[in-house]
Structure formats: structure tokens, C-alpha cells
A protein has these predicted regions:
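Enriched for short, Lys/Arg-rich terminal
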Residues: 1-11, 15-19, 23-26, 30, ...
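A short, surface-exposed loop/turn module that caps and links secondary-structure elements
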Residues: 34-58
């Protein structure tokens, strides 16, 4: 039995979530808690980002993207951004 990963949201990700429709907020939170937190290896569900976002991981949920840092030593998934796929990669 693997240990569960903790999911935390930084201030920017919380602000991003608040801008979204309540239904998609619920879906994102459920996805992170039920799928990613319980995964033995959360990398299996995501994709590593490159270039200016190197070191971050991306999860897809419908047309939305969840950008995270994985801190393996702490078993922590830190969500740093959430948004629609058309805008999430803009800086």
C-alpha cells in the first residue's frame, strides 16, 4: 500500500480556481483528491513541462489544465496554476 500524496494549492492557484465556474472547480478538486492524491506515482497521470516551465507537471481535465510542482521527498503535489488550456501557458 502506497502512502497518499498531499495536495496543496498556492495563492495563485486558489485565485485561479475562484475565477472558474463552480462546477469545474468541483471537478478539479475532486480529480486532484480522488485520482492524483491516491496515485502511487502522480507522474503517471501528468506530463512534464519544458522550456520556461521546466520542473512543473501538467494534468488535463477536459479543457482545463492544472500546473503543479511535485515534491517527492514530502509526498506533496503543489498546485501553482489552474486555467483553461487556451490561457494557462501565458506568462
Amino acid at each position: 500500500m502506497s502512502l497518499a500524496w498531499r495536495i496543496e494549492y498556492d495563492e495563485g492557484a486558489l485565485a485561479d480556481l475562484k475565477k472558474l465556474d463552480r462546477q469545474i472547480q468541483r471537478e478539479i478538486l475532486d480529480y486532484m483528491e480522488k485520482r492524483i492524491a491516491k496515485a502511487e506515482d502522480p507522474r503517471a497521470f501528468g506530463k512534464p513541462l519544458r522550456h520556461s516551465k521546466f520542473g512543473l507537471w501538467r494534468y488535463r481535465l477536459r479543457d482545463y489544465r492544472i500546473i503543479c510542482q511535485l515534491r517527492e521527498s514530502q509526498l506533496l503535489v503543489l498546485v501553482v496554476a489552474v486555467g483553461h488550456r487556451s490561457k494557462i501557458y501565458e506568462e
